[in-house]
């Protein structure tokens, strides 16, 4: 049996709940190596289990979001709070005890429940429509936040001081008793007297100590000698996990969107002789450098944590030719140079369109926004000046020659690629999920760096500078034979990077160690 331990953590206190109201954009995408690898095991009917260390009251709806609802899991905080496994259950706020004269004020973002002239409660919802927080205000001052579990439990209450800062948090049992009191100022955790016999201490310096104690007890009952644990590498939990699981049973997964680089602290938190799984050339280089520095020889494998799965592409059915451009991971100077090239290129034909892809809409520089507006206005003015064209056009027909597509989740990538004729990624480390998705869609890729997933002149072009962009674009846009060859080559790669093959590579890494012992 394989066990997966993710790092779906808060940036400040890693054990705290990460759920936010649906309208708050996440700084990073949720989809990661753990979600993908578990999905592959589920798809292939292989046994696996999830172990969650942090407080995750909305775990079930989170798993459902990524088609992992059937995943078996163990939760440290479920053990602490005595919560049992059952299906999500939305809270009907109408059934709660409100004053007779309560007024419900509906807004696009929250529900405001006015209970008196000086008090009101705001109810916040997840993207699935579940109530996640009730926040009580007195004289416009936040007093308490009630944190709800997606199974219908009241999971915790956070209290705020007179300055509106979080003061302490109580974690509740299924019966509504306080089992843990966490001081949010100094981090200390106190176990309520009624439950102290379940713990080795009555007080802990921080929640991480208590979590490690409960984790140790959990794995002593669940994990056996032949089992293997795949851990999302994170310096905040690596050492605690390694303290209780033998190195031969451990693999650490390094994922570029989580581990941009490997620090000394993170590498030293990894137990000697554990396996290492990496998804990028840069992370592999970082780890090799650390291995040489500390004279270690951890077995390592570089694989994609994302599977290929053939997806539709309708670019040949469209009148316009859509060119996708990944703009993340580039310096301002390089991005400006590339955009100038591309703007000049699409001016050659009226049917060329640019779709700029980014995970970080708020980080798009002002000059680029102005460039997009200017090019679009110039194009529309040209269309309006053409009497024959403008006579046939309605306001709905006026389209933009350059558009921005924000990638909130990985399905946004798949959706964007449906209409693209090809995709460009000139960043120093081409986005892995974009490459795998382009293979799945069968479209050519133009990259500025050599990778395992793009073969020059086969399913794409590898160019050294943006000066070569025109030739690379012409190669696929002017010659259908070249595009068709890239499509056929991508179909072959779909088999190579299918989920069963990725799992086989993982098993070879794990079983190789077992054979050696």
From Swiss-Prot:
This is Accessory Sec system protein Asp1. Disulfide bonds: none annotated. Belongs to the accessory Sec system protein Asp1 family. Part of the accessory SecA2/SecY2 system specifically required to export SraP, a serine-rich repeat cell wall protein encoded upstream in the same operon. The keyword Plastid does not apply. Keywords: Protein transport, Translocation, Transport. It comes from Staphylococcus aureus (strain NCTC 8325 / PS 47). It comes from the Bacteria. The keyword Protease does not apply. Pfam families: Asp1.
